[in-house]
Structures are given as C-alpha cells and as structure tokens.
Amino acid sequence: MPTRPRSVLLLCAVALVGARPLERQSAPPLEITYLANMGVLLEVGNRRVVIDGLHRAELDGTPPVPPDLLGPLETATGRMRGVEAILTTHRHLDHFASRSVRARLASDPIVHYLAPSEVVDTLRAHGPVSFPNRIHGLTPRPGGRLDVDVAGIRITALDLPHNPTRTPRAQNVGYLIRLNGVTILHVGDADPTAERYAPHNLPAEHIDVAIVPTWYITESSALVRQHIAPRKVIASHVWLDATEKLRRDVDREWPGAVVLMRPGERLRIDREP
C-alpha cells in the first residue's frame, strides 16, 4: 500500500503519546465532548453529530448523562444546538432513552435520528413521534453495511452484533461517520471478535479516530490493531467506580489512547500551523 503524507497533531487537554496524526490536510480540527458512558458529541468545523448521548439511566454501574448536558441535548439549546444527526447504536438503557429522543425530535425541526430498527420500533411503540420522516431505522444484513447521507454527512451503519457476554441480546450497529474529511468509527457495544469485524475490512477505511469500550483495549487490543487499525483510539464505557488504574491499564496496552471518564470533558485535535 503506498504511504500517504503525514502531519503532526496536537491534542489539547490530553497528551497523546505516540498517536498517529490525521492525514487529510483539508480537514478542520475534530472536537469530542464526552457525554457519559459511550455518548459523545462530535464536531468538525460546522458539522455536528451525537452518538449514544440521549440516555438517562445508570445501568450496571455506568453513569447517566448529567442534567447539565442532558437538558440542552433534549431541547436543542446551547452547545447542543445545530446537531444534524443523532445516532443510537442499540436499545440498552445506558445508550438510549425513548423519552429523551422524543424530546429532542419535538424541539428540533432539523435533526435526523438514526438507529437500529428495533430501537426505532421501541420509539414508535411509545406513541406518535415528531417529524417521523427524519427517523431512520437501519438493519444491515449479517456482516453487511448500509450507507446513508444526512445533509451531506456520510454515515455507514455496520452490522456489529452486541457483545453476548456482558448484557442481554440487542441489535447493535456500529457507525462510520465522515465529517469534513475526518473518518470516525463508533462501535457501541459490539462483540470484539474477528468473526464480527473481518467482513467489514475496516483498515481500508483509513479510520482517523475509533471510539471503543475500554475492554477492547485492555482485553482485545490485537483485534483493534488488526481489524480496525485506527490512527487514534478513544476508550470509553467506564463504570462509576473507575479509577486512574484504568487509564494506566489502557495506556499499557495502547500507549497514547485517551480514556473518557468525566462527562463534559472535551478533546480538541488540532494541526500544527
């Protein structure tokens, strides 16, 4: 494979040791705001996407989105105004709250909502929803993908079944998001096995940032290197009692990986002038 040119990045707020840079010279900075558990707000230039950020429950020791973030998320106010797409990976309560999604759709006439079909079915089972034409149920075929364009944002839904060892069955979808030249992968709670990842050939996607559960790094880092091959790793899905030991454990397996632990913390990835 030919070698592409590389640039040098600075990560403000968190130092990344040994991280590989984003390589698309035209891409503006990527900003990530941690919402809770696997929830993030992604911003690249004027494009904004939220993934797994609308949930209210503390489930199995995972933190809910705090009120100072959840309120603006539900009402499309403050920094949460102007989000063009909200994505949910699966229906578990530490990733999805029907009440919160319905509130956002009712208060925001622009946003599109993308989720596995069983999540959309749950949403609609609770009664009529605002702007149903902006709700997209996604069911990729086994090992397959579905491509969606939302206001010029290219989103690919990947069939990545839920990790069967951690919580009850759920239809889990991973997402590839292309924001102004930056490619981001969010896997939800996908099963970290080669069987699930190999069909997608993700190294060919040249992923700039992969957002994965912490156990992907502490228990399955070889899979991430071989079947995702991201330039930068962001680890989340932490428990309320997580300590700095978790950061050390992640750093030992993947030097330079960032662990998101405090809701509201923000990362900004800049290029040197």
Q: Locations of the language-model features?
A:
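Bacterial Sec-dependent signal peptides at the C-terminal "C-region" and cleavage site
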Residues: 12-26
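Active-site-proximal loop/helix segments of hydrolase catalytic cores
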Residues: 160-227
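Active-site neighborhood of phospho(di)ester-bond hydrolases with catalytic His/Asp-centered motifs
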Residues: 51-54, 82-94, 114-117, 185-189, ...
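Binuclear metal-ion centers of metallo-dependent hydrolases, dominated by the metallo-beta-lactamase
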Residues: 127-153, 224-273
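Active-site HxH/HxHxD metal-binding segment of metal-dependent hydrolases
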Residues: 74-145
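Conserved beta-strand hairpin/beta-sheet module of binuclear metal-dependent hydrolase folds
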Residues: 27-76, 168-188
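Bacterial N-terminal signal peptides that target proteins for export
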Residues: 1-9
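Pre-active-site segment of Zn-dependent metallo-hydrolases
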Residues: 47-91, 98-102, 165, 191-205
